[in-house]
Amino acid sequence: MGRTYIVEETVGQYLSSINLQGKPFVSGLLIGQCSSQKDYVILATRTPPKEEQNDKVKQPRAKLDNLDEEWATEHASQVSRMLPGGLVVLGIFIITTLELADDFQNALRRLIFSMEKSMSRKRLWDVTEDEVSERVTLHICSSTKKISCRTYDVQDPKSSARPADWKYQSRVSASWLSLDCTVHVNIHIPLSATSVSYTLEKNTKSGLTRWAKQIENGVYLINGQVKGNDCDLLEGQKKSRGNTQATAHSFDVRVLTQLLLNSDHRSTATVQICSGSVNLRGNVKCRAYIHSNRPKVKDAVQAVKRDILNTVADRCEILFEDLLLNEIPEKKNYELPQRVFVPLPGSTVMLCDYKFGDESAEEIRDHFSEMLDHEIQIEDLEIAEEVNTACMTSSVNSEASLTNTSEEQPEQPKKTIGVKIQQNIGVIAALAVAVLAAGISFHYFSD
């Protein structure tokens, strides 16, 4: 028996409303949440067409093998940034004509693996062993309305298609639980004499990888309490009378990161010449959502962890893209983009995007519409309340980096020898005393 997908009814209405308009196919993304028992699909969004594709609409015999894999993969990467913790790109859908119904499976398989590879490359976290790794492909025939739902294990390159159940249901995410967290980020990334020549982006990613371990190993307080991983998240919560669907639970989460290593871990300090540093500082707003069907604490904590890691990494990546796109000259201080939330109609879930200070609300609205193919209202935009907007500072000591050349490198062995002599000075002194004593004894017995 394959996996079961519980799908919001509005997703079915959206898919039914898509008109091919002479195109051989239309493809897009399915967004939702995985759980051990079943998966939930709460949103579908078609991939926006390329501008140059508008001139090729009149080609009815186009093959699905010509599906622009790179363009669809980039769309998935962009949309993944707009998902708070707990939500993922669950898979893809494709709507085709009857003539092309048998020509889609290979193209879908390649696309689903390409998307997963692209999105996983940017992650600061690793997939756990017990995590659901199946992703869905949904094929709809525009003529017969027949649905074919299959899954692939994206962690297994040799995975073959498995059938899955596709079931519509109303108000799937109307009572999902939200977890809110504000994290103060203070990441110091020293630049060694060798890494100072690397790009700001590469050095930042290296530092974020080390910081991610702190977040992964942190202690998470949910409403001020530490709960066991296998406990029910709603344990101890009062049940509301009447319609439980109308009540949305919200949890406050705080993160305690470990400053010192445990006593059973030995630490050795690495001393190196630094020619500068990169610093990330500020408060970032994090938010995660989890289904209300007996959710576990470990699933909620994992959703929060990943949102913390994703939002910081995404902000840095957006900054680097902006610097490259607009050819902004290097400077010491950069302001990271702020997070903006927007509600999903009929749901307690909010999606997100990022804006720089000089971007207008209209630009953010248009970006939401382009990426998610859903109209939103400007008044629904919620800019995250970040008291200190996260920023990045970069300082490079050019003199230090220039003086630390290969000409000075031969001195390092001398320093090492000197250190070794200091470390073994006691042994040397003892040896000298022993030699002196032996000499005196020899002289004594000679007399």
Swiss-Prot record:
Keyword Transmembrane among UniProt keywords: yes
Name of protein: Protein odr-4 homolog
Principal location: membrane
Pfam families xrefs: ODR4-like
Localization per Swiss-Prot or TrEMBL: Membrane
Native source species: Mus musculus
Bilayer topology: Multi-pass membrane protein
Family, per entry: Belongs to the ODR-4 family.
Ranges annotated as spanning the membrane: 82-102, 425-445
GO cellular component term of the entry, any: membrane
Keyword tags: Membrane, Transmembrane, Transmembrane helix
Top-level taxon of origin: Eukaryota
PANTHER family xrefs: PROTEIN ODR-4 HOMOLOG
Function text: May play a role in the trafficking of a subset of G-protein coupled receptors.
Tissue expression notes: Ubiquitously expressed.
